[in-house]
């Protein structure tokens, strides 16, 4: 064993590690505060047209954070009257889930993290008409829930610009159930 327990290079390396941790930690805190202040300032739903593969509409708000022990989910409302094939339904639901996720990343990141920590639950339910789909969308927006309406491009099975899927959430399961709880599973 040597005379010294720590030589100067070990001390300098230790200080450098602690300094880099401190700087990174402070940066993360500031960045998290900035994102949270953006979402906390939103009082009304946003609405936006988007050109995700099939095209979509969206609206969101901070509603749906729930409590710490709440379950979170996303519900995909599929139009059953269009008689889409299984693959087409899967693709349209994928567009809806991705669209809703992208909007939640920007507008409700804390809620999104809660949903991710609960396993990213997604439930597919059905409606029998466009009118019923739009009524669900209107109620979800009234409840200030994140929504993403998918319109088909019309390249395969169904007519162009058909409203195929509505994604609601992610949000607290209880909040979503108030809007979609009466619908039957797909």
Curated annotation (Swiss-Prot):
Coiled coil: none
Keywords: Hydrolase
GO terms assigned for molecular function: peptidyl-tRNA hydrolase activity
Entry's family note: Belongs to the PTH2 family.
Function: The natural substrate for this enzyme may be peptidyl-tRNAs which drop off the ribosome during protein synthesis.
PANTHER family from the UniProt entry: PEPTIDYL-TRNA HYDROLASE 2 (PTHR12649), PEPTIDYL-TRNA HYDROLASE 2, MITOCHONDRIAL (PTHR12649:SF11)
Protein name per Swiss-Prot or TrEMBL: Probable peptidyl-tRNA hydrolase 2
